[in-house]
């Protein structure tokens, strides 16, 4: 392997991956290739050493096993962001919140509800990242993908991505790697429609209305901080992958059954395929409150948000998985509803 083969990308041996993830767990990589440009990223993907490599960017939505033998990792660190005629183009390794800030600095609305989400721009289309009533599928114009099977890279449209709730064709694909993403934003400086009740109330706006996008960003960040969902090194509640489970979509019959079994209202929202339930409510009402299982546990639920599985400073992946499995199984036993992990699990399963 030569520098020319990798277009100058840095190669390191025996690198601990835990510090490169927001959950701060994971194995030691035998080889870490850091690509700081799209040229280097493509070269690494085409090189023999990179053909089966694990792709790692912001590390905010992945759970890596404690031990993975003979592991080569390509770290996506190309980070250029450009703006032209209301189109924001972000290289895959660009910090996501930097993309949001850049859009706002150019007077463009549409991404502000997604403020404060950790990770990289390239990860956002993979699972159609969303929060507070918005998702990237609302604004993505096209995505540049590298196909590891053919060695080609092409721009594809949202129709090719088959976006759904926290999913896309990329989520379960090993061969497609995001190189760049383009977002078509509101040149009039309007925010995205404020569909999320808590956010609309914070801004004193009717649901579905709009507001100044900078004010929306400020409100979103305040809400996220209150839930431990903005990265903060001293705050162990932020050592997580955010929400560990997606909000389940159930049939109308299952929703009615659940409502009849519990006291009080069941938080729910209309969904194209049924009724969406609040996973956090299910977790807490199955007996797993904030901070479960207690102060001495290496992995515990956030003290601010029961849907986040957190590392209290010395957890292993095995600890994290064991807690997530306990919560998932408890919700299934209590309510007959299966929770699905939101992060990508690599080398480990629930």
Curated annotation (Swiss-Prot):
It comes from the Bacteria. HAMAP family: MurB. Pfam families: FAD_binding_4, MurB_C. Pathway: Cell wall biogenesis; peptidoglycan biosynthesis. Its main location: cytoplasm. Keywords: Cell cycle, Cell division, Cell shape, Cell wall biogenesis/degradation, Cytoplasm, FAD, Flavoprotein, NADP, Oxidoreductase, Peptidoglycan synthesis. Residues 25-194 form the FAD-binding PCMH-type domain. The keyword Transport does not apply. The lineage of its organism: Bacteria, Bacillati, Actinomycetota, Actinomycetes, Mycobacteriales. Its EC number is 1.3.1.98. Belongs to the MurB family. It comes from Mycobacterium sp. (strain JLS). This is UDP-N-acetylenolpyruvoylglucosamine reductase. It catalyses: UDP-N-acetyl-alpha-D-muramate + NADP(+) = UDP-N-acetyl-3-O-(1-carboxyvinyl)-alpha-D-glucosamine + NADPH + H(+). It is found in: Cytoplasm. GO terms for biological process: cell division; cell wall organization; peptidoglycan biosynthetic process; regulation of cell shape. The gene is murB. One of its GO terms (molecular function) is UDP-N-acetylmuramate dehydrogenase activity.
């Amino acid at each position: 392997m030569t520098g020319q083969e990798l277009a100058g990308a840095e190669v390191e041996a025996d690198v601990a991956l835990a510090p490169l993830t927001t959950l701060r767990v994971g194995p030691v990589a035998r080889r870490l290739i850091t690509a700081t440009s799209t040229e280097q990223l493509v070269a690494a993907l085409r090189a023999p050493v990179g053909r089966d490599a694990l792709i790692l960017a912001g590390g905010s939505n992945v759970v890596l096993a404690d031990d993975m033998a003979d592991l080569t990792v390509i770290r996506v660190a190309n980070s250029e962001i450009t703006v032209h005629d209301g189109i924001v183009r972000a290289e895959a390794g660009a910090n996501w919140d930097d993309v949001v800030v850049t859009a706002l600095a150019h007077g463009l609305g549409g991404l502000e509800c997604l403020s404060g989400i950790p990770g990289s721009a390239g990860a956002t289309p993979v699972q159609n990242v969303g929060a507070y009533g918005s998702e990237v599928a609302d604004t993505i114009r096209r995505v540049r993908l590298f196909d590891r099977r053919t060695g080609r890279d092409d721009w594809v449209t949202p129709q090719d991505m088959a976006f759904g709730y926290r999913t896309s064709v990329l989520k379960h694909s090993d061969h497609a790697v995001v190189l760049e993403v383009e977002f078509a934003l509101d040149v009039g400086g309007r925010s995205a429609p404020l569909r999320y009740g808590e956010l609309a109330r914070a801004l004193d706006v009717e649901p579905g209305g709009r507001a100044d996008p900078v004010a929306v960003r400020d409100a979103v960040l305040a809400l996220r901080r209150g839930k431990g969902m903005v990265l903060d090194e001293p705050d162990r509640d932020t050592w997580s992958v955010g929400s560990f489970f997606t909000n389940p979509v159930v049939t109308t019959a299952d929703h009615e059954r659940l409502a009849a079994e519990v006291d009080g209202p069941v938080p729910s929202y209309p969904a194209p395929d049924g009724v969406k339930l609040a996973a956090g409510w299910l977790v807490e009402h199955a007996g797993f409150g904030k901070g479960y299982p207690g102060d001495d546990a290496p992995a515990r639920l956030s003290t601010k948000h029961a849907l986040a599985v957190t590392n209290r400073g010395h957890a292993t992946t095995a600890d994290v998985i064991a807690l997530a499995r306990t919560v998932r199984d408890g919700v299934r036993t209590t309510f007959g509803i299966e929770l699905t992990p939101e992060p990508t699990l690599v080398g480990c399963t629930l």
